[in-house]
């Protein structure tokens, strides 16, 4: 295997394969082994683990994960990177490279197929590692959570501002629908900040590594999860409006007067704003909406 730990190594690999970093895919390759080893430590990998890595790039993190885990499935969307990735990981017999878009891949099915059913839906939980570009972070995390893929934890690199959103508290500027979804399903923790200088090419912003440990059960109990998230999205749809106006304008439910009654039943002031509500308050609104005949 090739140790990808400097700009010179990245440039040489790309020169040999006639490729260059694609800005449209957010390709900034992590080249600091100290940071990589901290990510591996955070994932607490053992030979019993299956790791699914999303966006392996040139394989710097993949190689380190392969040294600890039983098997690594590296899912890469960029077909042009695959020969370079294969070269870097040559000799790593427990790594399998899969060309695929993380927004489409059925990770549970993939895990099951590659482990004869030992992992994935109906099997053991696996671990996810990812260095996520900004454009992909929200949609992918929501998909992974809402589709209930059978992972035990995720350790992800995200832009620093996104890390703040994942862990934000009600009443703060960073708190939003993504915060609610992540905190509903997982216990998120920002582990450490990552300067832009440890990537090649360096991005325009700093990043952070976040650990998302799946909760044994969601943070709050709701009668209908789909309705809960519909209410959350509606409440954050118009951040400058009051909660009542946001819900009434969302198209969800029969109208303003009905929403006023729903909020009254839930014990929520209609003049509040969505970003001030806790998960339990969103749950109360969703259940009250169902009591009023919503669906």
From Swiss-Prot:
Keyword terms: Cytoplasm, Methyltransferase, RNA-binding, rRNA processing, S-adenosyl-L-methionine, Transferase
Main subcellular location of this protein, as a coarse class: cytoplasm
Annotated binding of S-adenosyl-L-methionine, by residue: 28, 30, 55, 76, 101, 131
The UniProt record lists the keyword rRNA processing: yes
TM regions (residue ranges): none
Localization (cell): Cytoplasm
Molecular function GO labels: 16S rRNA (adenine(1518)-N(6)/adenine(1519)-N(6))-dimethyltransferase activity; RNA binding
EC number: 2.1.1.182
Gene Ontology CC, one term: cytosol
Record keyword Heme present: no
Protein family (similarity comment): Belongs to the class I-like SAM-binding methyltransferase superfamily. rRNA adenine N(6)-methyltransferase family. RsmA subfamily.
Functional description taken from the UniProt entry: Specifically dimethylates two adjacent adenosines (A1518 and A1519) in the loop of a conserved hairpin near the 3'-end of 16S rRNA in the 30S particle. May play a critical role in biogenesis of 30S subunits.
Protein name: Ribosomal RNA small subunit methyltransferase A
Organism: Pelotomaculum thermopropionicum (strain DSM 13744 / JCM 10971 / SI)
